[in-house]
Amino acid sequence: MPTVEELYRNYGILADATEQVGQHKDAYQVILDGVKGGTKEKRLAAQFIPKFFKHFPELADSAINAQLDLCEDEDVSIRRQAIKELPQFATGENLPRVADILTQLLQTDDSAEFNLVNNALLSIFKMDAKGTLGGLFSQILQGEDIVRERAIKFLSTKLKTLPDEVLTKEVEELILTESKKVLEDVTGEEFVLFMKILSGLKSLQTVSGRQQLVELVAEQADLEQTFNPSDPDCVDRLLQCTRQAVPLFSKNVHSTRFVTYFCEQVLPNLGTLTTPVEGLDIQLEVLKLLAEMSSFCGDMEKLETNLRKLFDKLLEYMPLPPEEAENGENAGNEEPKLQFSYVECLLYSFHQLGRKLPDFLTAKLNAEKLKDFKIRLQYFARGLQVYIRQLRLALQGKTGEALKTEENKIKVVALKITNNINVLIKDLFHIPPSYKSTVTLSWKPVQKVEIGQKRASEDTTSGSPPKKSSAGPKRDARQIYNPPSGKYSSNLGNFNYEQRGAFRGSRGGRGWGTRGNRSRGRLY
């Protein structure tokens, strides 16, 4: 094996040869053999091999393999030097291979190495985006689990940093095509990341692009299958997919398939849903999603049937007034509970779909049923007025910091809920019922949000290797507003301020897209 002096001497031969470098194959071979030497020889080889690589195409495989040996050296400084120089090997047909190698090197736990690998990948991305994507997706589809995970996170965090001249329409089409292959077998967490990747592509910002994404989500949600409320994996899949679909819906991209599925398959099973996440009010979560989607529902095939299912579910949460004894006191032991959070969602959804069949209450219900509904509305409205007054009194004069306490935050949300229900009930009391009022759902921001705007999410953009996510999503403690006890004592329900989109579990541990474990070793 060559000494340091021999390496320098052969480096000099190549450096002085200028245009005739390719004639000194023996000198380059000496430098390649430097990877078999000691620490000093390896450091020199890591720098010299890439410098003259392009002049010796017949030694390309040997040169790349020599550099890879250095990328796996026990000495961290040698590894870092070798990784830093890898982009110089990314020429012509070698680029996809280098991209594949760099993708595998993402599995390092050394933060400096991880940074170098990221930078090297970005560097070759700018040389040839398609070739780089070939290497990345090759590992996502066939590589080890840790490599797959980090390659997906690389795409989800780094693609958006690349300029338009790199992410051309053709490149984005390749990303979509390859992503569809991956989506045939993914976990929930991976699915969320891919939706983040795809929804950020410029070519998918159009109406037709958004429609493509909705179809991808619908396919992932298995909307053709019968819903199994007792299977937490089935429930989790539907929730995750619907959360990804909601920001995509607009007046031009309809939610009809999802709303139909919720009305036909989920609402009838609402009380038997198995929660996939401990501490989550699964029924309220489902009703919130339905309410958000109902605004963008198009023409529905079985509108009357589904509206009736929604109406029947609403009645379950709109109690009749308690019977009074002869002395005027409540004959029962307990007042009915008024579940305002649930009613806001159901009433809003009914109000939205009712616009499409405005004579439902007057022509489709018999007189007795309509009378019963109005009694329930009236009773609920009376209880509502009591709480609205109590909430306004509790918040009166409070501004700034005073409104930021947890207790007052909950009361502010409670006031939004009760005000929303009040507006919707007034509409339905009209003769004939009206569907003209507009309200903003209590958990939605008041300011206008652009159609298709993505929800904020945490990025892995630091220079350190991503840490493994915890098994369960981080959620704020449930916040329940308990109004003062009295004639209309009730719970307003749970107010979850957490951002949606977290997924419980990882590949190999859950049924949704669980992938077989593979041990593949070095694939360079």
From Swiss-Prot:
A motif (Nuclear localization signal) lies at residues 454-475. One of its GO terms (biological process) is fibroblast apoptotic process. Residues 487-497 have a biased composition (Polar residues). The modification Phosphothreonine is found at T399. It is found in: Nucleus; Cytoplasm. GO terms for cellular component: cytoplasm; membrane; nuclear speck; nucleus; spliceosomal complex. Residues 462-472 have a biased composition (Low complexity). GO terms for molecular function: fibroblast growth factor binding; RNA binding. Antiapoptotic factor that may have a role in protein assembly. Negatively regulates ACIN1. By binding to ACIN1, it suppresses ACIN1 cleavage from CASP3 and ACIN1-mediated DNA fragmentation. Also known to efficiently suppress E2F1-induced apoptosis. Its depletion enhances the cytotoxic action of the chemotherapeutic drugs. This is Apoptosis inhibitor 5.
